[in-house]
């Protein structure tokens, strides 16, 4: 009976996260978030957005997601939510999105081992190589506030902002390796962008009174998150319930501690101590990710499926799934409402509202560059410069044909086709992986 309940709850969870991705309300992968405004605004179709989501996510599913679960026996966020990002973006309607997500949840609990064997059976490791896409995407996206400053303000302010943002990254990497440099970098960049914009408005108050007319990109996009708050709250409740069932761990900082806590032979006192340690670790990790998640949500209108991830810490400490579900919904709803207040406040300043196009342009340009660079990394990892040559040839073939595949998605499509061709060449005896 317990297994059936677990299957039902997990299926509901993955179905709902797929639905959130389909509605462009929330996703798990930070790199997919800046892509979805393109989909919402009609600059990209679902096939193109789905190919990017697949390329960004599938490597982590095959490596981190499956390997962590096989090692610990616990489900994890990479395994549950990255595939539903892909399925939700690709689905043509809400019902299909929920259904595909729910099917994935059932498959995880019933067919994980055969799926893992299938993913790792190819002679050329396409899925593992696609993991190379993610690092450039997240690192490049962290620069969007800085690039927006370049577009909107003079060279002096741009130079100062560049020095501050880049030195922040250098200092964090050198002296605080436990912190996420992208989250700090994007936070400092947003502070610089907003500080320069608000200072500009205050200096020109007499010439151009500050008013609240019009919507900034922040208020416009946070309002979209608010419209999806009921769905987000349900996901928060389901995440909490699954974690409270002791079958799920939220991140790498807690999964191995929880494995020990839930293992046989551990006394209740020892187990609770380990659970408390895991909850504290998740809370501290969540603090580090608040700047990244909050600022990207404000800029893109797409939230994270687990919010600021504080819901994980609450889940572990809850006495039962029912209490956990209530607390999870409350925590993630409070986070969303706080975002709305921040978005409305920012909308009072004309220069912040005028930053909308610059922010969009910066995100689009950075994503194009990052996906191109990441795809090159992936192609080289597959087959050295043979893979590079094939991928570049396919990319420029798309250019010569008038871009039947949109420019942002083209590198990812090219590297996936490269992986398929390399496996065909292997089976024909024309290529041997290194």
UniProtKB/Swiss-Prot annotation:
Keywords: Cell membrane, Membrane, Transmembrane, Transmembrane helix. The keyword Cell membrane applies. Signal peptide: none annotated. One of its GO terms (cellular component) is plasma membrane. It is found in: Cell membrane. The chain crosses the membrane at residues 50-70, 72-92, 95-115, 135-155, 158-178, 179-199, 229-249, 288-308, 319-339, 376-396, 412-432. InterPro entries: Uncharacterised_YhfT (IPR019733). It is a multi-pass membrane protein. Pfam families: YhfT. It comes from the Bacteria. The keyword Flavoprotein does not apply. This is Uncharacterized protein YhfT. It comes from Escherichia coli (strain K12). The gene is yhfT.
